[in-house]
């Protein structure tokens, strides 16, 4: 019996192979991929379906399992990729805008404080969800307000940064959300000064991370008072492989699809590293990469 879906203005795609979309080039089929036309379209879908809903962004920090994703997978499209200057060093960005584009836009507006975002792959929505950060700064320190739709009731909410209850690489909101828009605040600075800082960050990233490989950013969060890469290295896991998956030799908190890996290859290798670190140091590493889909 065919599935009955709400009549939306956006686009439904069916049986979408996620390995064609994700940065790691792994993942089975998503039953239904939905790109809403606007916020009202998204809300209408959520309020009028009983199917499970998942959310993806740029998929730059994600493993989609080989079994794929059941139900509806929502991905915000170009309609949500806007970035615009407001006033007084404030910038509004849609949930699908890239963090790196926000950093460059801020530079053009002579707004400093957002430079760290240039080295973080992913979207505004994903960055808000995980409190993305680098080089001593994070989203929580520069975001002012956030608009989000709740995946349970389909209602639109607005939160201040304080109300988000931000913690290291996460927030304290209950339930599941899709982040639609955010306002960011920086400070005035010269364009050339900001441009120099952007170049510094990119150069540092290129030297220290496997930017040309199929990767999904840092595998694990840094435990309190420790650096994950040092624990991984100290456990002898640098360069470790499993099937087509490998721990990067350049930066060992990065997981690589170097030879047609499956999602299972990658996830199993990550768990092997976790177990090895636990045995060696009695410290439990927590995934920073999001794993989506059923076993």
Swiss-Prot record:
EC number annotated for this UniProt entry: 1.3.1.98
Q: What is the lineage of its organism?
A: Bacteria, Pseudomonadati, Pseudomonadota, Alphaproteobacteria, Rickettsiales
Q: Which reaction does it catalyse?
A: UDP-N-acetyl-alpha-D-muramate + NADP(+) = UDP-N-acetyl-3-O-(1-carboxyvinyl)-alpha-D-glucosamine + NADPH + H(+)
Q: What is this protein called?
A: UDP-N-acetylenolpyruvoylglucosamine reductase
The pathway this protein participates in, as annotated, is: Cell wall biogenesis; peptidoglycan biosynthesis
From the UniProt record, which GO molecular function terms apply?
FAD binding; UDP-N-acetylmuramate dehydrogenase activity
Keyword Cell division in the entry? The reply is: yes
Q: Which residues form a coiled coil?
A: none
* Locations listed in the record: Cytoplasm
Name its species. Answer: Wolbachia sp. subsp. Brugia malayi (strain TRS)
């Amino acid at each position: 019996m065919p599935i009955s879906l709400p009549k939306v203005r956006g686009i439904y795609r069916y049986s979408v192979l996620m390995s064609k979309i994700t940065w790691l080039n792994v993942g089975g089929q998503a039953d239904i991929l939905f790109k809403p036309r606007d916020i009202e379209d998204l809300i209408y879908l959520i309020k009028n379906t009983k199917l499970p809903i998942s959310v993806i962004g740029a998929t730059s920090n994600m493993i989609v399992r080989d079994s794929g994703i059941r139900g509806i997978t929502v991905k915000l499209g170009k309609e949500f990729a806007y970035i615009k200057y407001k006033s007084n060093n404030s910038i509004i960005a849609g949930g699908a805008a890239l963090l790196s584009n926000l950093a460059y836009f801020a530079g053009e507006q002579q707004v400093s404080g957002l430079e760290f975002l240039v080295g973080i792959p992913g979207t505004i929505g994903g960055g808000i969800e995980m409190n993305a950060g680098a080089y001593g700064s994070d989203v929580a320190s520069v975001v002012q307000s956030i608009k989000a739709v709740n995946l349970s009731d389909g209602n639109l909410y607005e939160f201040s940064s304080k109300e988000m209850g931000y913690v290291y690489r996460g927030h304290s909101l209950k339930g599941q959300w899709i982040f639609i828009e955010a306002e960011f605040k920086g400070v005035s600075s010269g364009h050339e000064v900001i441009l120099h800082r952007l170049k510094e960050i990119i150069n540092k990233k290129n030297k220290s991370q496997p930017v040309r490989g199929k990767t999904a950013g840092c595998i694990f969060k840094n435990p309190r008072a420790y650096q994950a890469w040092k624990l991984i290295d100290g456990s002898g896991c640098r360069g470790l492989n499993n099937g087509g998956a490998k721990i990067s030799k350049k930066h060992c908190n990065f997981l690589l699809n170097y030879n047609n890996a499956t999602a299972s290859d990658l996830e199993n290798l990550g768990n092997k590293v976790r177990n090895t670190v636990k045995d060696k140091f009695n410290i439990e590493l927590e995934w920073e990469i999001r794993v989506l889909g059923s076993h």
